[in-house]
């Protein structure tokens, strides 16, 4: 991707998969992670326990502080604050719901100050359909990020989730331009289901804004 980040905010950190990649790519970066589930959060702490530039907050991000229900998947990285649709279970049968648990939700500004986000900063979101609510929970600090890296779905996998088109439009209105699409997942009929999308703040694009 050719990026250089000094700060990474990892929302939906799970067991630290993305944070490990970020640490490899950006050895000196500060990483602030959010993971509401106790099992994955415990694994994350074990993985990064010796890294003084990594911190973990054990709650989800949303537009307001709350306590709510999380739908726990048999594969915990597919857990969501939104219920699964039959389509999710059909395409990814190993991700069926195994139960629910109560988690806390907060806003990004309640956990970190803008002055702590050394530029360039990246906001990563992997929250299983809850991307728009998570972004709203980050909006006060959104201008601090040069990059947003988010999973986007082209079909509804979780009830009421934002789809990729609306996610792209929301970020575009805030001067973020889609600059890369990675890891596209297709169903058995060859239709795109979801992908990871990289957005860059427009001022970083050599072509300017339109």
Show which residues each predicted segment covers:
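Phosphate/nucleotide-binding beta-alpha loop and adjacent structural elements of enzyme active sites
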Residues: 1-210
């Amino acid at each position: 991707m050719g990026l250089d980040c000094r700060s990474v905010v990892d929302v939906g950190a799970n067991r630290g998969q993305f944070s490990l990649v970020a640490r490899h790519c950006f050895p000196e970066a500060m990483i602030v992670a959010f993971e509401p589930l106790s099992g994955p959060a415990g694994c994350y702490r074990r993985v990064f326990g010796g890294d003084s530039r990594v911190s973990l907050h054990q709650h989800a991000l949303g537009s307001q502080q709350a306590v709510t229900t999380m739908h726990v998947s048999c594969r915990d990285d597919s857990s969501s604050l939104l219920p699964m649709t039959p389509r999710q279970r059909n395409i990814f049968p190993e991700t069926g719901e195994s139960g629910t648990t109560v988690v806390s939700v907060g806003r990004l500004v309640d956990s970190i100050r803008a002055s702590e986000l050394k530029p360039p900063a990246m906001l990563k979101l992997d929250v299983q359909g809850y991307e728009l609510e998570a972004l709203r929970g980050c909006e006060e600090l959104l201008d601090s990020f040069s990059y947003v890296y988010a999973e986007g779905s082209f079909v509804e996998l979780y009830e009421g989730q934002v789809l990729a088109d609306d996610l792209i439009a929301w970020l575009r209105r805030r001067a973020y331009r889609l600059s890369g699409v990675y890891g596209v997942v297709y169903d058995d009929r060859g239709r795109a289901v979801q992908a990871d999308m990289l957005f860059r703040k427009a001022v970083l694009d050599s072509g300017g804004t339109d």
